[in-house]
Amino acid sequence: MMESFSETKSSIATNKSTTPTHEVQISKELQDIKNEVFELKKSHEQCKEKGIKVKKDINDVFKHADDITNTLAKHEKESSQLISRIKHLNAKEKQLDITKELSAHLDQIKVNVKRAKVSFTPETGSIFVRLFLGQVNVKHMRENEKFRLKQEYEKFKKKTNPQFILFVVLLLLYPQSSFVTTSWQIWLLYYYITLALRENILLVNGSSIKPWWIMHHYLSIAGSLTNLLFPLSESFSYFLPQVTYFSGCQGLVQILTNRYQQGRLYKLVAMGKANIIDVTGESEGWGNDPGWTPSALFLFPFLLFVQFFQLYNSFSFFAFAYQRSGYVEWQVFSCGFIFLCLGLGNLLTTLSVYYQKWKNFSKYNKEN
C-alpha cells in the first residue's frame, strides 16, 4: 500500500513538472502557426494587388491592340486612296520615276499592313465556328495559349481514336441493340463536329492544316448526321455490318496515322522546319524535308486500303439503290455520294502527298 501510494505521488509530481513544458510547446506552435497565417495573409494581399495591376495592364494591352488595329485599317484605306490618286495623275516622263517610287512605297506599306493585321485583328473564324460560338474572338495572342490549343487537339484525337474500336466491338456483340447503334451514331457526329471546330480555331491561330482535311470533316459530319437519321429499315440492317467493319479499319489506321504524324512533326519542329502549333507533318511549307521514311512507306498501304474501302462503300450503296425496284431511303443515295467524295478526296490527297515526298526525296539525294 505504502509503495503504491508513493508511486502514485511520484507520477503526479512528474505530470506537474511536464505540464508547463507541454504548455510552452503548444504556445510556441500556436505562435508559429499565427506567424505563418499572417505571412500567408500578407502574401495573399500582395498577390491580390498584383492581380489587379496585371488585369489593368492586360486591359491596357488589348486597348492598345484595338488602337493599332484601327490605325492599320486607316493606313490601308489611305494607301489605297493614294495609289488611286497616283494612277489618275497625268505625269510627265520626268515625273514617272517619282510616281513609280511612291507606288512602290505604298505597295510595301499595304503588304506590311496586311501582315500586321494578321497579328492584331480579332477573328471570329469561319461560318462553322460562328454557328457554334457566335461572333466571338477565337484568336489567342499568347504563344503558350496557342500551343495549349494544339495539345488539347492532339489529346482529343489520342483519347477518341480507340473508341472507334470499342464501338465496333459493341456493335458486333449487340448488332440488334438500338441503344448501342444510336450511341455510336451520336458519338460519330460529336467526334467530327469537335474535330472540325478545333481545327478551324487552330487555323485562325496560325496552324498549318490542309484545306481538304477541313472539308473532309465537314463531309464526315454530313455522313454522321445522315447515319443518325437513317431509319432502322432493311437497308440499314443490310449496310450496318459493312459500315461497322469500315469504322474499325478507319480507327486502326487513324491510330497509326496520328503516331506517324506526331513523330514527324516533333522532328520538324526540332529542326526548325515546322510551327510548334501545326497539327500534321504534311504542310506544303515543309517541302525541303524529304519525308520518304520507312514509317511513311509502312503507312501507305493502310491508307490506300481504307480509301478503297470508302470507294467500295460508295459503290455498294449505289448498287443497292439500283437493284431495288421499290422505295429506297434518301439516306442510301446520300451515304453513297458522301463515301464517293471522301474516297476520291482522300485518295487524291494521299497520292499528292506521297508524290511530293518522292520528289523531295529524289531532290535531296541529288543534292547530297
Swiss-Prot record:
Residues 1-23 are annotated as: Disordered. It comes from the Eukaryota. The keyword Plastid does not apply. The chain crosses the membrane at residues 164-184, 186-206, 212-232, 236-256, 291-311, 332-352. It is found in: Membrane. Its main location: membrane. Signal peptide: none annotated. InterPro entries: TMEM120A/B. Residues 25-96 form a coiled coil. GO terms for cellular component: membrane. Pfam families: TMEM120A-B. It is a multi-pass membrane protein. Keywords: Coiled coil, Membrane, Transmembrane, Transmembrane helix. PANTHER family: TRANSMEMBRANE PROTEIN 120 HOMOLOG, TRANSMEMBRANE PROTEIN INDUCED BY TUMOR NECROSIS FACTOR ALPHA. Belongs to the TMEM120 family. This is Transmembrane protein 120 homolog. The gene is tmem120.
